[in-house]
UniProtKB/Swiss-Prot annotation:
Catalytic activity: L-citrulline + L-aspartate + ATP = 2-(N(omega)-L-arginino)succinate + AMP + diphosphate + H(+)
Keywords: Amino-acid biosynthesis, Arginine biosynthesis, ATP-binding, Cytoplasm, Ligase, Nucleotide-binding
Pathway: Amino-acid biosynthesis; L-arginine biosynthesis; L-arginine from L-ornithine and carbamoyl phosphate: step 2/3
Record's subcellular location: Cytoplasm
InterPro entries, alphabetized: Arginosuc_syn_C, Arginosuc_syn_N, Arginosuc_synth, Arginosuc_synth_CS, Arginosuc_synth_type_1_subfam, AS_cat/multimer_dom_body, Rossmann-like_a/b/a_fold
Enzyme Commission (EC) number: 6.3.4.5
Name of the featured protein: Argininosuccinate synthase
Gene that specifies this protein: argG
GO terms assigned for molecular function: argininosuccinate synthase activity; ATP binding
Family, similarity comment: Belongs to the argininosuccinate synthase family. Type 1 subfamily.
Positions contributing to L-aspartate binding: 117, 121-122
Assembly mode: Homotetramer.
Length: 401
């Protein structure tokens, strides 16, 4: 019997896909779950997958690889999609695709399958990953084939086959969770006119319910990578988990946004990224201290393109690798500590230090002129403004002004 390897989350979509693949393709279904830091959500998945009809399930602990090979490079790049989204779902998909391919080759499978809808970005991210790593594998996307047209239909399908699902018709949210974030879509969020109900939050308290006293936290970085909290060296997983707790308690990292999907439509989601928001803010503060103006400004342009690549699922591509090389070069001096003040959803710098600081107090303050002769500024301004002067003279001569 041919085998298919399914990216299995245990949620509504992939729960019904197991039965659907067996009924419509006659395949043996092997479920693969990537442990990216979902926590307690993973506990019932083995039993659930087997009860749903899978022949076996792999639950792979990919947390370390996820943080160090996917999150940290994106953090160093400063990549943020459309100024708000910290890419928590986006950079998880290429890693899942990579693991699907590895297990498909190990099992001798002829196909891989996923539960992404035909309207979303994830179908692109999964399938680009497979095309880049194993173009010979068939990819099955049930949402593009079956007669199920809504989550309500999927619930009916599951209930008719005795498949347990974690949602009801009255409370339907589509969620994606990993060690970096949790996303919420669906329900009242489908209308941008509706205020989000913060009852949905799982990692973060609403800012108004955060402590009335500020919390201070100090992050240590080595070459752009976070390595310590309040002076304590920590492994990557422990560091991010601890910052999630600290940020969550202080209402940090809640984003409600309407974004432009790759497939051409807009969508709305609420994202919780408490630890990630702290790291992005702290990393930026350290770069402001340690990078020269030209490099910093050019890197901002790179960050926009990097964010698009990650969002679009083009992770396994020469351009992303080339951009990583540029970013890594810029991070050689991004070493130091950043102290932040957290208060009711807000962050403020409370002290930044680095052995590679480019801030020179003698140059920056109004002290003596031995180091910086202010009279030199006149010549600089004359030369810097020369193109403006020449154009103004031309316009006057030509009667344009």
């Amino acid at each position: 019997m041919p085998k298919v390897v399914l990216a299995y989350s245990g949620g509504l979509d992939t729960s019904v896909i197991i039965a659907w693949l067996k009924e419509n393709y006659g395949y043996e279904v092997i479920a693969v779950t990537a442990d990216l830091g979902q926590g307690e959500e993973l506990a019932p998945l083995e039993e659930k997958a087997l009860q749903s009809g899978a022949s076996k399930i792999y639950i792979e602990d990919l947390r370390k690889e996820f943080v160090e090979d996917y999150i940290w490079p994106t953090l160093k790049a400063g990549a943020i999609y459309e100024g708000k989204y910290l890419l928590g779902t986006s950079f998880a998909r290429p890693l899942i695709a990579k693991k699907l391919v590895e297990i498909a080759e190990k099992e001798g499978a002829v196909a891989v399958a996923h539960g992404a809808t035909g309207k979303g970005n994830d179908q692109v991210r999964f399938e680009l990953g497979v095309k880049a790593l194993a173009p010979h594998l068939k990819v099955i996307a049930p949402w593009r084939e079956w007669d199920i047209r809504s989550r309500e239909d999927a619930i009916d399908y599951a209930e008719a086959r005795g498949i347990p699902v974690p949602v009801t018709k009255k409370s339907i949210y589509s969620r994606d969770r990993n060690i970096w974030h949790i996303s919420h879509e669906g329900g009242e969020l489908e209308s941008p006119a509706n205020a989000a109900s913060y009852d949905m939050l799982m990692l973060t308290v609403p800012p108004e319910k955060a402590p009335d006293q500020p919390t201070y936290v100090e992050i240590g970085f080595e070459k752009g990578i976070p390595v310590s909290i309040n002076g304590e060296l920590m492994d990557s997983i422990g560091l991010l988990e601890k910052l999630n707790v600290i940020g969550g308690e202080n209402g940090i990292g809640i984003v409600d946004m309407v974004e432009n999907r790759l497939v051409g439509m807009k969508s709305r989601g609420v994202y919780e990224t408490p630890g990630g928001a702290i790291l992005v803010y702290a990393h930026r503060e350290l770069e402001l201290l340690t990078l020269d103006r030209a490099t910093l400004h050019y890197k901002e342009q790179i960050a926009l393109r990097y964010a698009e690549l990650v969002y679009d699922g083009v992770w396994f591509a020469p351009l992303r690798e080339a951009l990583d090389a540029f970013v890594d070069n810029t991070q050689r001096t991004v070493t130091g500590t950043v102290k932040l003040k957290l208060y009711k959803g807000n962050m403020m710098p409370a002290g930044v230090t680095s052995p590679y600081s480019l801030y020179d107090e003698e140059l920056s303050t109004f002290g003596r002129d031995e180091v910086y002769n202010q009279a030199d500024a006149a010549g600089f301004i004359n030369l810097f403004g020369l193109p403006l002067k020449v154009r103004a003279m031309m316009e006057k001569k030509a009667g344009l002004r």
